[in-house]
Amino acid sequence: MKKISLLFLSILSGMGLCQAQSYTPVSLPSMFADHMVLQQNSSASVWGWGTASSTVKIIGSWAEKDTISAPVDCFGQWKAVLPTGKSGGPYALQVFDGTSKIVLNDILLGEVWLCSGQSN
C-alpha cells in the first residue's frame, strides 16, 4: 500500500510540472545574433524558449518557402533543425510564435571552421 501511494504522489507531482504557464515571449540564446555565419549545405540546430505547449515557427530568408515548426514542450523549451543552402548572404532569420517575433539580420551562409591548438 505504501508503494502504491508513493507512486501516486510522484505521478501527481510530475503532472504539476507541466501545467500551462503564462505567456512567455519567444527567445533565443545569446549565441544566435545578427551578423552570424551558419555552415552552408548542412543542417543548423536552432533552439530557445517560448510559451509552453505552443508552436514556434522559423523561416530563413535563403529558403522562404520552407517554414520549420517546432513544438514548445511543457518546460517552455523548443528545438528545430533548419536546412541551410549554398553560400551567400546576407540573409535574415525569423523566429515567431504568433504573438512575438525575433528577426536576426545579416546572416551569412558559408564555411565555418574551428581551429584550436597549443600555443608555445
What are these regions (language model features)?
Residues 1-23:
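Bacterial Sec-dependent N-terminal signal peptides
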Residues 21-52, 107-111, 115:
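Non-catalytic, glycine-rich low-complexity segments
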Residues 8-10, 14, 42, 70, ...:
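N-terminal hydrophobic or amphipathic segments with adjacent small-residue motifs
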Residues 14-16, 35-36, 81:
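A generic structural signal for short coil/turn motifs at secondary-structure boundaries
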